[in-house]
Amino acid sequence: MKTHYFLLVMICFLFSQMEPGVGILTSLGRRTDQYKCLQHGGFCLRSSCPSNTKLQGTCKPDKPNCCKS
């Protein structure tokens, strides 16, 4: 019985150490904005998009721009 409690405490400790949004939803199929940007041929840039590209959105959580040629 003590082993069960020990394992339960260890699992709770491991989950409490994770940062919010560590990838629980991403691993279930939800994709990040950065992933979507890259999949659609864009690239993430912290400054404004170059003149030969256009703004497609953001690459959260840092909110850099998603630029596409």
Swiss-Prot record:
Transmembrane segments: none annotated. Has bactericidal activity. May act as a ligand for C-C chemokine receptor CCR6. Positively regulates the sperm motility and bactericidal activity in a CCR6-dependent manner. Binds to CCR6 and triggers Ca2+ mobilization in the sperm which is important for its motility. Detected in kidney. Residues 22-32 form a propeptide. Monomer. Homodimer. InterPro entries: Defensin_beta-like (IPR001855). Disulfide bonds join 37-66, 44-59, 49-67. The keyword Cell division does not apply. It comes from the Eukaryota. GO terms for cellular component: extracellular space; membrane; microvesicle; sperm midpiece. Residues 1-21 form the signal peptide. Belongs to the beta-defensin family. It is found in: Secreted; Membrane. One of its GO terms (biological process) is response to bacterium. This is Beta-defensin 1. Keywords: Antibiotic, Antimicrobial, Defensin, Disulfide bond, Membrane, Secreted, Signal. It comes from Mus musculus (Mouse). The gene is Defb1. One of its GO terms (molecular function) is identical protein binding.
